[in-house]
Amino acid sequence: MLYNGNKGPIIKKHAADELGLTRTSITRASEQLKKMGLISEKKSGKESEMITVETGYTLYELAKDHLINPVQKTICVSVKPHKESFIAGESALSKQSMLGTPKIDIFALFKNSNAVQSLTEIDEQWDEGLFAKIELWKYDPKLFANNGMVDLISLAMSLSDNEDERVQGELQELLEKYKW
């Protein structure tokens, strides 16, 4: 809904189809969003529409305390990332801001992806063959990814615990400049 911009109401059925969720899941989610004061609903014929109370950055600011960090676990690997992975973390931020590129590239991969089974985790302290860090995500980053990178909102949530002032400053600037 944050990426919907000013395009108007979202039909629940369409949201469920687009996100690969059941109508029951969307109904539960919309009930939670209503309780948080982020949306209202109205009936349009047989369809139920969700309408956000705000749009763009203002909606993000209202919602961010309710959003989750998508990263369940980060592992280090010595192989090139799988084609199902997306540039994430400081690597993604560095490509969109003035932040320097991290020494080790960071990618996101859905934790339930078949590609995860083929990865061999290594200890970055002992293995010099480190190629990348893989963030295993709670949901598929492909849902919102753009141009081979994770989406901005998921990126912001994944970096929310990062205490580096440079990272937070660049992230804030990126969020404010983003064309919602």
Residue ranges and their predicted role:
Residues 6-19:
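Short acidic, hydrophobic short linear motifs in intrinsically disordered regions
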